[in-house]
UniProtKB/Swiss-Prot annotation:
Belongs to the RecF family. SUPFAM superfamilies: P-loop containing nucleoside triphosphate hydrolases. Coiled coil: none annotated. It comes from Caldanaerobacter subterraneus subsp. tengcongensis (strain DSM 15242 / JCM 11007 / NBRC 100824 / MB4). Gene3D superfamilies: P-loop containing nucleotide triphosphate hydrolases, RecF/RecN/SMC, N-terminal domain. GO terms for molecular function: ATP binding; single-stranded DNA binding. InterPro entries: DNA-binding_RecF, DNA-binding_RecF_CS, P-loop_NTPase, RecF/RecN/SMC_N, RecF_2. This is DNA replication and repair protein RecF. The gene is recF.
Length: 364
């Protein structure tokens, strides 16, 4: 899979322009604050339907403008081409199209254009709390499993309804008879979510272990702290039963905090390096290496599951790596289309080079 061209209009500081890209390494270089990351953000938007920086849609619109529009032409391994369009107005109207067909929701964009983003912020997945890891895990799985994405949406909707009911029970003293219905649904969706998460984390563990051993000769383990508290995570019926029981037992605590304290929305997974929790005990260098292995594993799993080579976006990553790791990652990226941002041309050899200045991208 590769991105043949992109057209941007009123996106961040980027000037209105159409760009054509190489199938190999596309080096985008220039001084800081000229728009390098903004270009990668526009590309990633066509893949995931949201900013990889966590920005609101309104923040992507150029200053003093009313809208932004991004269009990309993507070719898959079978040479089938897709035109993906994303338009947004500051009044909140959003239109996403694939080959001219309007999508009903942003989530429907997932899977049409596969990308993996590498950035210095990847270390946050290792360093920060459970919600950061859950968010990352859910995004990775949702791209390759539409059923998981649906279950996640339904679970979160049911969770919100249950939390509203808890407030009603606390304030009005009625509605407790409805909890059984919500608990059944949460257990049903939750069991499937837990099973799929476990399967993905098994693949992630195997892949990360391989990469970490190659890079630094260290051992890695992943421990999934599933909310059902079961060891046999492959038995969906058992997971559902255990999760339902835990929801029932946590009612007193739920009413105290007016929120559901048990379920996939509270889960976490630990990444252990040489037997120690990397979040707590690993050095900054070990955490950064673990984050690199995590993203390489995401890439490997995505390719295995889809049969497509994702497009790789490396946002100011090279400056964070020593020479050995830099050579290692460049070797792993061979055969993929990649977009690498850097402040100069000296460190990375690109098949195509683009200089960016004040939002204008010029091919050299």
């Amino acid at each position: 899979m590769y991105l043949k061209e992109i057209f941007v209009d009123n996106f961040r500081n980027l000037k209105k322009q159409k760009l054509e890209f190489c199938e190999g390494v596309n080096l985008i270089y220039g001084l800081n604050a000229q728009g390098k990351s903004n270009l990668l953000e526009a590309i990633r938007l066509l893949s995931m339907g949201r900013s990889f920086r966590g920005s609101k849609m309104s923040e992507l619109v150029k200053f003093d403008e009313e809208y932004f529009y991004v269009r990309g032409l993507v070719r898959s391994a079978d040479f089938y081409e897709k035109k993906i369009e994303f338009g947004y107005k500051v009044n909140g109207n959003k239109v996403i199209k694939v080959n001219g067909n309007k999508l009903k929701s942003t989530g429907e964009i997932l899977g049409h254009f596969l990308t993996v983003i590498f950035s210095p912020e990847d270390i946050e997945i290792i360093k920060e709390g459970p919600s950061r890891r859950r968010k990352y895990l859910d995004a990775c799985i949702s791209v390759i499993d539409k059923n998981y994405f649906f279950d996640l949406l339904q679970y979160n909707k049911t969770l919100s309804n249950r939390n509203s009911l808890l407030k009603k029970i606390k304030e009005e003293g009625k509605g407790e008879d409805l909890l059984e219905i919500f608990d059944e649904k949460l257990a049903e969706y939750g069991a499937r979510i837990i099973k799929v998460r476990n399967n993905y984390l098994e693949k992630l563990k195997n892949s990360m272990s391989k990469f970490l051993m190659e890079i630094s000769n260290e051992k890695l383990e992943i421990i999934y702290l599933n909310s059902a508290g079961v060891k046999e995570v492959h038995e969906e019926n058992l997971i559902r039963e255990k999760l339902k029981n835990r929801l029932t037992k946590s009612l007193t605590l739920d009413l105290k905090y007016l929120s559901t304290q048990v379920g996939p929305h509270r889960e976490d997974f630990k990444i252990l390096i040489n037997g120690y929790d990397s979040r707590v005990y690993s050095s900054q260098g070990q955490k950064r290496t673990a984050a690199l292995c995590l993203k390489l594993s995401e890439l490997e799993i995505l390719e295995e599951e889809t049969g497509e080579k994702p497009v790789l976006l490396l946002d100011d990553v090279m400056s964070e790596l020593d020479d050995n790791r830099k050579k290692y990652i460049l070797k792993k990226l061979e055969g993929f289309q990649s977009f690498i941002t850097h402040t100069s041309k000296s460190d990375v050899e690109g098949d195509c080079c683009f200089k960016i200045y004040d939002g204008i991208v010029m091919r050299e």
